[in-house]
Every structure is written in C-alpha cells, then in structure tokens.
C-alpha cells in the first residue's frame, strides 16, 4: 500500500496509510509505539477491515521509512507536534474520509500520545483502546533534568546510552532468563527476531526526543482535561509486560485517568503475554476482546 502524505501544523510531512472500506462502521486511528513503525500494524488493519472498520495508520516523527533522522522529532516542542500530528490525522479522517465515528488506538508510547491528545480533544473520539500502556512515574522530572544536562555536552541531536538505559534498561532486565535485550517485548521468538532484524525498529532516540518523551509522560499526570467526553476506554496488556508496571503502575494509570474525567474504563490483561500483545502467539485472544469492545454500547 502506498503512503499518503499530509502536512503537520509546521508544514512537516506526516506519512499515513489508509485502509479504507465501503460503508465502514467507523475508523480506527492507530498510533504506534516507540522505535517501531506503522507497517507492523498491517495485520491489525486487515483484521479491523474484516470487522467493518476503516483504519488509518501513521509513522510518528523520527520513525518509519520516510523520516529524515531516526529517533529525532523536532528542533523544539516535539512533544506538542506529536500531539498535533494526531489531531491533523483525525481531521483528515473527518474531512477527507468523511468518517466521524473514530476509535483512537495507541500502543505503548502511542498510548502516551493518545492520552495527551484526549486532554483537549476527547470529543473527537467515540472509543479509545490503550495497549501496553506506560504509566506516569515520579522520576520523570528528574529524567528530564538529566537529559537537559547531558544535552549541554552532546547537543540535542546527539544520542546517549545513559538515557537509553534509564528508559529501557528496566524493561530488558525484567526478563530474567533472556536470550536478547529485546525479549521483554514478546514471548514469541518469531516476533522478537522480526523486530531485531527490522532496520526501522530499535533505533535509539536522540536526547531531544527523550526530552519530548518525558514531557509527554508528565502530561499523563495533568490534573484536568478540557471539555471531557467520558467515552469508553479499553486498557489491554500482557500480564508479563514490564512497561505497564504491574498493579502499582496500572493503579497509577487508573488514578490519573479518573482525575482527568475518564472513568468509563474496562481492563483486560492476558496471561503469559508481554508487551506486544498483538504479536503474541495467542494474539487471537486479544483480537476477540477488541472485537467485543468495538461491538459493545458502553456509552
């Protein structure tokens, strides 16, 4: 499938793929995770098409085939541009595809962006699905300070193993008898190998991108949202996913969502699965829950 190019508010290109069908029930807008790309969601889009939904995927800035620099978002305010890009895509779905029933799907870092989008734009979406969702952590401000300090010596466009380890090291160590440092994403060796061998996956973030990521994480803890529409939200994760933070992390996520006005929540966790539940060997269980959620009238 060819890319469709649209422009962000700063005139930078956003590359999307449109999996459109006739007379769709709605459109699922997909926000992928950190250090991956939209083509890893082809199976998801195909399955959602069969359920009667159009799908629009996109590559985040600094990700995918068409980016100028892997792991780099923008010279400044990259966190805000990542949010506005998704609003631009939503406008495309509404105004070009003429679909107003939009379900927002975010995986991992994509779920962080999705939650930041909801703070001021919740009325644009009928339902939300958050997969492998990270939670707000009190150490985020310290991480942001550390990134700022490191950038004095390496510049914002440089990379830092210290920040790589601070952000991802805990996830890697969560799998005790790991064969690779990527084992935390999945129990499926095929999926792990596909990720490792994909040149568009696993590329380190620049220092400025880590700053933007930390600012987005801080946004998860915002006290209130604007003109909240309390739509149904499905939270899904593998029980062995270190990103969610087990019960403590999940409770923090629920607490923050509730405080922002979102309490129409449904949570499903899956035994013997890690971070990328859409790519696990038992992924059909996940798709069954998604299909059930899409078909429910939870409003």
Locations of the language-model features?
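Short beta-strand/loop motif that positions the catalytic acidic residue
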Residues: 235-237
